Amino acid sequence: MTRLVLGSASSGRLKVLQQAGVDPLVVVSGVDEDAIMAGLGPAATPADVVRVLARAKAEQVATTLTGQQASVAADCLVIGCDSMLYIDGRLCGKPETVDDARQLWRSMAGRCGHLYTGHSVVRLTEQRVTHRDDETSTTTVHFAAPSDDDLEAYLATGESLKVAGGFTLDGLGGWFITGVEGDPSAVVGIGLPLTRDLISRAGISIAALWASNPLP
């Protein structure tokens, strides 16, 4: 019975999986994302950046499980994810301040950006890594142009500081999204179609995943 482990503190990713009928064990990685990005250098593509970050998260969680939760590491699949918005030639993670979020939203208003989401899986069998795989999905997000009052009210909620690109599709920010080209679940943080492919390549069916990780 393969346990699914989500290596992320993202409530959005957890919600996507739970709405898809899976209740994963959550183990947060705590990797140093800034150090990893600095190591990649300026030549790294957006797709590579989020993929490498997702891989680092999945591998760190797998290492933690092997050392601290042997019963889980006996048969589990760890999935790590990372999302970033690419617009105006730069990758944007979570804004650090409200002013950063304000400037980002002003640059996005009435335009579109590309949301890159890296997905990485590590399968553990008897405390050993038996499979690794990773891939990136890309989704185009079209933004509305919120009024100054609406933007300030949104920024005051604090939501924009918690998510990559300073926006959500499934939360308060959804009011200011006019369309999505690609997988909506990837915009929330974990793409179900790509995750299904990665899980399948690890030798696990969705039926088995449902059976091993039922909702309470």
Curated annotation (Swiss-Prot):
Keyword tags: Cytoplasm, Hydrolase, Nucleotide metabolism
Assigned EC number: 3.6.1.9
UniProt catalytic activity: a ribonucleoside 5'-triphosphate + H2O = a ribonucleoside 5'-phosphate + diphosphate + H(+); a 2'-deoxyribonucleoside 5'-triphosphate + H2O = a 2'-deoxyribonucleoside 5'-phosphate + diphosphate + H(+)
Primary site of residence: cytoplasm
Domain of life: Bacteria
Active site (record annotation): D82 (proton acceptor)
UniProt GO BP: nucleotide metabolic process
Cofactor (UniProt): a divalent metal cation
Record localization: Cytoplasm
GO cellular component, one term: cytoplasm
Family: Belongs to the Maf family.
Function noted in UniProt: Nucleoside triphosphate pyrophosphatase. May have a dual role in cell division arrest and in preventing the incorporation of modified nucleotides into cellular nucleic acids.
NCBIfam families: maf
Name the record gives this protein: Nucleoside triphosphate pyrophosphatase
